[in-house]
């Protein structure tokens, strides 16, 4: 007896394979391998090479607003849904997505910051903006950190080193 297959659906295994392929394509399209380290990147003229984890946290929380007396920090943060953002929310901010949004709304409302972080939609966009914006700092997949930008050490460690905190 022949099994009937609808013209719309196909078999269960075909659907499962298609969904699995789409899932893998989504991971590949995100540009970030699961478990890859996250690099903090700045322009080469930023006068900092190393940050302690506490300093990094203050930077991304907007508590440190200047690199030097005349070079303002501009935070660039990946859009919601990016793996890099999830890692940074968990490790640096130690907040959920909702807490992060509320934190920046309150900080701007209290006039502790002129605005929240600027949103970027890819590591490539982050790198391009950091290159052209004095004082900008962003986080990108360490494997995609572009040449020409400075990768900051965290607690004296570069991405890929044992003990590096952002992964």
Task: Show which residues each predicted segment covers.
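Short alpha-helical segments used as structural interaction elements across diverse proteins
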Residues: 11-12, 98
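N-terminal export leaders
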Residues: 13-18
């Amino acid at each position: 007896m022949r099994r009937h297959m609808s013209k719309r659906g196909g078999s269960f295994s075909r659907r499962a394979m298609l969904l699995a392929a789409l899932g893998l394509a989504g991971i590949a399209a995100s540009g970030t391998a699961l478990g890859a380290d996250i690099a903090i990147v700045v322009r080469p003229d930023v006068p900092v090479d190393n940050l302690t984890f506490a300093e990094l946290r203050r930077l991304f929380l907007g508590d440190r607003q200047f690199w030097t007396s005349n070079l303002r920090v501009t935070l660039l943060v990946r859009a919601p849904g990016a793996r890099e953002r999830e890692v940074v929310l968990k490790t640096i901010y130690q907040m959920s997505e909702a807490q992060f949004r509320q934190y920046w709304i309150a900080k701007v409302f209290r006039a502790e910051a002129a605005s929240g972080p600027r949103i970027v939609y890819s590591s490539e966009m982050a790198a391009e903006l950091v290159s052209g914006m004095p004082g900008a700092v962003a986080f990108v997949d360490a494997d995609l950190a572009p040449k020409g930008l400075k990768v900051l050490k965290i607690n004296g460690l570069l991405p890929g080193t044992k003990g590096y905190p952002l992964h």
